[in-house]
Structures are given as structure tokens and as C-alpha cells.
Design a protein with these regions (language model features):
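Bacterial N-terminal signal peptides
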Residues: 7-19
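Active-site machinery of serine-nucleophile hydrolases
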Residues: 90, 94-145
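C-terminal catalytic histidine-bearing segment of alpha/beta-hydrolase fold enzymes
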Residues: 212, 216-218, 236-292
Length: 292
């Protein structure tokens, strides 16, 4: 009996040793560090339909661009058909003195101006950009250029159909901007203003220009409009253009009091010069041009 107990103890001990050895053999594998799975890049956010999320369109008010030339307050309009991919024409417009930047209380005062709104109401869908600058000299001209380039880089803009339109102080600004960077603009509407830029670069790049000034303009006077026309015409001739070619890209209109009276303006012809933005044929003339 004692021998049987001894044999059973030996058998039980051997079994325990065998189990312990198996457990120790399995331990390293169970504790081995498992390599992490490769990170999967997240999918782009899409709308429930599977299409990219829609782009905000309409009027985007009172934005700020911190540029190399300083702070640029601006607003812009994206037509409903803008999708962020299909390039559209763009019009850069600058208002007169009374709608420039004079602090927060003046912010957005350019948005009910006909010179901004008119382009949004045409059959041709266009991006419209307007800044409120603080002067009408070289600083403002370079800010207008910087804003134009910002939109060319960050929005779907047809680079061959970028236009400018300036009234009064805004015209002084944009006449310089167009002369400094004529490669950016296809056509320019110069309304009730004086020309402060050079002529030769505009002609050499073939920028189309429409000059508008009331014959009775009390601030600048029609002589400055004619001087701008003559300077540009001479520059086009010097660049080798024939007169009929010049006529296709350079226009001037200095309407008289009767013309203005037909449009409800009987005084303050400088301020009344804003009616040019109601002349659809002039706006469409601007938009008909592409960069050469």
C-alpha cells in the first residue's frame, strides 16, 4: 500500500513538472510585442450623397487679408454656380472716397454701391471683389494687386478674364495697379477719375480701357479724361497698333447734361458718374475682353 502511494506521488509530481514546462515554453510567445497596424489615412469629408461638401456662395462680407502691404479689408461675391473647380471671370472694383476705410464704422459701406452690385446682376456669372483701402496712391495700388493675386491663388478664377473697375479715388488706385501689373487684367473701367498710372505698360500688354467722365464733372473735369485717352492712344500707337485695333480696346465717353438728365441726374455730375454702372452695354464691353 505504501508502495502504491509512493508510485502515485511520483506520477503526480512528473505530471506537474510537465505542465509547468509547457506553461513556461508558451509564455514568451504570449508576451511578444505585436507590431502596430499601419495607420490608414482618413477619407475626405463628403456630403451624404458622396459628393464634396457645397461651397459657400453669395455675398461674403467684411473679410481681412493681412498682406505684405498691410491690412486689407475686403468683401466678395461668389455666384451660385461657383463650385470651386470651374474657373469664372473676376471683377476687382474699388469705390470712391466716401466708401473707403475709416475704421469699423465704415466696414461694408461699399457693398450697397452700384459699382459692386452691378456685376452681380449680369447674365455672365462672375466673382466680384471689392476692397476698402485707406489711400489712393501706390500703397493702395499694391494692395489691389495683392488682393487680385490672393484670389487667383485661392479661388477658381479664369486668369484670362480678370477685370478692374474704379470710381473716383478707386480709379486713381486701379489706374496705377493696372499699369504696375498689366499682366493681371484683361480690361479696366476707369470711371470719373484721373489716370495716375503709366500708359506704356498698359498698351504693351493690350489691356482694354473704357474711360467715362461727365462733361460737367465738378471734381476732375473732362480734360483729365481726355488726357488719359490721349496718353493711352499714343502708347498704343507706339506699341505698333493700328487705329482700328486701338478703337477695339480703347473707348472714351464724356456725356453731357442732357444725357445725365435722361437718367435722373441734374446736378453733382461727379457723384452722378456712378450711373456708368447702370450702363449694361459698357459693363458687357469690359467683360467681352480676354487677355491677349
Amino acid at each position: 500500500m505504501q508502495m502504491l502511494r509512493f508510485a502515485l506521488c511520483l506520477a503526480l509530481g512528473a505530471a506537474l513538472v510537465s505542465l509547468s514546462a509547457c506553461a513556461q515554453a508558451a509564455s514568451p510567445a504570449s508576451q511578444a510585442t505585436v507590431a502596430p497596424q499601419a495607420t490608414v489615412a482618413p477619407q475626405a469629408t463628403v456630403a451624404p450623397s458622396g459628393q464634396p461638401a457645397p461651397v459657400q456662395t453669395g455675398l461674403i462680407r467684411e473679410q481681412i487679408l493681412e498682406g505684405e502691404t498691410g491690412t486689407i479689408p475686403y468683401s466678395y461675391y461668389l455666384p451660385e454656380e461657383y463650385d470651386g473647380e470651374t474657373p469664372l471671370p473676376m471683377v476687382v472694383v474699388m469705390p470712391g472716397y466716401d466708401r473707403m476705410w475709416f475704421g469699423e464704422e465704415s466696414s461694408g459701406s461699399n457693398l450697397d454701391w452700384s459699382g459692386f452690385l452691378c456685376w452681380t446682376e449680369l447674365p455672365q456669372e462672375s466673382i466680384v471683389v471689392s476692397a476698402q483701402l485707406t489711400d489712393w496712391g501706390e500703397t493702395s495700388a499694391r494692395q489691389a494687386i495683392e488682393l487680385t493675386e490672393h484670389f487667383l491663388r485661392n479661388f477658381a478664377v479664369d486668369a484670362d478674364r480678370v477685370y478692374a473697375a474704379g470710381y473716383s479715388a478707386g480709379g486713381e488706385t486701379l489706374s496705377q495697379a493696372v499699369a504696375l501689373r498689366p499682366d493681371l487684367y484683361a480690361a479696366y473701367l476707369h470711371a470719373a477719375s484721373q489716370w495716375d498710372g503709366a500708359f506704356a505698360p498698359v498698351a504693351q500688354s493690350g489691356v482694354a480701357v473704357y474711360i467715362f467722365m461727365a462733361e460737367g464733372d465738378e471734381y476732375y473735369g473732362p480734360e483729365r479724361a481726355r488726357a488719359a485717352y490721349d496718353g493711352l492712344r499714343s502708347a498704343y500707337l507706339d506699341a505698333g497698333w493700328a487705329q482700328e485695333e486701338i478703337d477695339a480696346v480703347l473707348q472714351i465717353q464724356t456725356p453731357d447734361a442732357e444725357w445725365f438728365a435722361q437718367r435722373g441726374v441734374t446736378g453733382n455730375y461727379h457723384g452722378g458718374g456712378n450711373v456708368v454702372f447702370d450702363e449694361t452695354s459698357i459693363l458687357e464691353w469690359i467683360l467681352s475682353h480676354s487677355k491677349r
